[in-house]
């Protein structure tokens, strides 16, 4: 996701760039002057970001921000999953018929090795792995934007 949105006039000339953090919970800004139309024109021609597990700083530090601080979308999603008792990634992997996990190496067929290594430092064992974290780290299947477990779940 891009960290900013271009606003374009009727000639498709960029007249402003709006940081994503300035648009959270401020729908009234779209009603001022010609902003809504400018935003739509900008979005229709702004390049789409590749689907990956990298988040813009606007989403990891400034989500729903005031002038001093904001929230982190990744932390918020992990906590939401825990609050709703979403099972861990390895449970869903097993439910999809992809085997069970007892060691970190069992994940390397679905998640790139470097990311598995990083996960092994953040989590005590594979059974603790949050579904949200693992699903955004899964290797994307050809022709899709999803990994194996989330696509089979």
Please report, for each region that a protein language model flagged, where it lies by residue:
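Polyanionic, low-complexity segments and short acidic motifs
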Residues: 1-153
């Amino acid at each position: 996701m891009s960290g900013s949105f271009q606003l374009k006039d009727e000639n498709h000339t960029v007249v402003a760039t709006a940081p994503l953090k300035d648009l959270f919970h401020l729908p009234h800004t779209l009603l001022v002057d010609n902003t809504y139309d400018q935003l739509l024109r900008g979005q229709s021609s702004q390049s789409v970001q590749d689907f990956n597990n990298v988040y813009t700083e606007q989403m990891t530090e400034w989500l729903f921000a005031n002038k001093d601080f904001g929230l982190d979308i990744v932390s918020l999603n992990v906590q939401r999953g825990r609050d709703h008792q979403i099972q861990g990634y390895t449970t869903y992997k097993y439910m999809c018929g992809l085997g069970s996990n007892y060691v970190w190496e069992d994940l390397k067929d679905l998640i790139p090795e470097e990311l598995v290594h990083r996960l092994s430092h953040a989590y005590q064992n594979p059974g603790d792995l949050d579904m949200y974290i693992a699903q955004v780290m899964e290797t994307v299947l050809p022709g899709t934007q999803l990994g194996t477990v989330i696509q089979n779940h």
